Every structure is written in structure tokens, then in C-alpha cells.
A protein has these predicted regions:
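Domain-length accessory/inserted modules outside core catalytic folds
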Residues: 1-128, 132-208
Length: 208
């Protein structure tokens, strides 16, 4: 298993607060930021960022989920076709392999670096909505044993999930801010994944 002590989130409180001042608060009926499993029903994800976030939340608590129909654990009314199932299986394999990588090479599914910053911020909020949804649906609760750092990270994710970002301008400073926020989310995910998931290096991470 990777040494997750390297994955302590960097101090990005000021960056998070900066983005929380931008745009309006988004409130999604399906992905309302709550860890309650009561919010586990819906028609499916609205974007690849949201889908990947939900998968990450699932894998943090159910690393033995089926690689071919893992989405059924999250979305009761989500009915992908055969081609989409292949894509979902590939996403599962790529995600769990990246989360178990010694190189910490997991990458968030976001618009390209040269896309408008507002669209990247919005995708970040969707990814965070998905992560919280996946964690809550998969069993995370107030009773789950987590470190103080992980609890703080989850609180930050809930806050970020409510960002709209429509007022963000395309400046170098804000581009640097969003890159720092992305890194914070990456490392924070490794932190909670390392605390919650039971996989070892000898476990086959794709055969389910």
C-alpha cells in the first residue's frame, strides 16, 4: 500500500475561502451536500467530474465493488448502454489503479487547462458533489472513525461543492489558485482513501 503519510493535504484554507466568495451557491436536489444516505436516489450523474467523484467516494468505503456494475451501488435509475458500460468499467479500472499508485498519479476529470477557469471551477464543484454523494451512499457517517485531517478535508469538500464559480476571471493568479485547489483535493482524497479502504498491494484491484 502506498505511504499515505505523504498525502497530507496542503494548507489551502485561503484558496478555499477565495473560491467560496465567487459566484452563487449551487444547490442540487440529488447532490445536496450531506453525508446522509437519504440522498442516495437519483437518475445518475450529470457530468464526468461528478461521476468520477462519486466513484472515488464509493471506492473509499467499498473497494471490492464490481468493476462492471459498480454504478448500481450509487444510482438506482442509471441505465447505461453497452458502450457506456465499457467506459464505466475503464473508469473504474483507471481510478482504483491510480488511487493505489505509489506515484500518487490520480487526476481529476476536469476540463483542459486552457478551458475557461469558470468551467473548471464548476467542474471542481461537481466533482466534490459526487465525492460527498459517493461517500454518504457508501456508508460514511458521523460515527465513521476518521482523523481530524480527514474530517476537515470532508468539510472543505462540502464547501467547495457549493461553489458556482461563474464570476471567476481568466487570470494567471486565479489559474494558479485553481491548480492549488486541485492539488489539495487530490492529496485529500489519498488521505481519506488510505484511512478507509482495506486493499493491500497483494490484492487484485481489477478482478471483481
Amino acid at each position: 500500500m502506498p505511504n499515505y503519510s505523504r498525502a497530507r493535504p496542503i494548507g489551502s484554507t485561503s484558496i478555499i475561502n477565495f473560491f467560496l466568495t465567487l459566484g452563487s451557491i449551487i444547490m442540487s436536489e440529488l447532490y445536496f451536500p450531506s453525508l446522509s444516505p437519504a440522498n442516495s436516489e437519483g437518475d445518475g450523474p450529470t457530468s464526468i467530474a461528478e461521476l468520477q467523484g462519486a466513484l472515488c467516494g464509493l471506492l473509499c468505503l467499498q473497494a471490492d465493488a464490481s468493476r462492471t456494475d459498480w454504478y448500481k451501488n450509487l444510482f438506482e435509475d442509471f441505465s447505461p448502454d453497452e458502450e457506456e458500460i465499457l467506459d464505466l468499467t475503464a473508469l473504474f479500472d483507471q481510478t482504483i489503479q491510480s488511487l493505489n499508485s505509489l506515484d500518487f498519479d490520480f487526476q481529476l476529470e476536469l476540463p483542459a487547462d486552457d478551458a475557461p477557469i469558470a468551467s473548471r471551477v464548476y467542474a471542481l464543484s461537481q466533482w466534490c458533489q459526487g465525492l460527498i454523494f459517493g461517500l454518504g451512499t457508501s456508508g460514511l457517517s458521523d460515527e465513521t472513525d476518521l482523523s481530524a485531517d480527514s474530517k476537515e478535508f470532508i468539510e472543505d469538500v462540502i464547501n467547495i461543492s457549493q461553489i458556482d464559480g461563474s464570476d471567476v476571471e481568466n487570470t494567471e493568479e486565479e489559474q494558479a489558485n485553481i491548480e492549488e485547489l486541485i492539488e489539495y483535493l487530490r492529496m485529500g482524497l489519498f488521505l481519506i482513501f488510505g484511512e478507509l479502504q482495506p486493499l493491500t498491494p497483494d490484492t487484485d484491484i481489477t478482478e471483481h
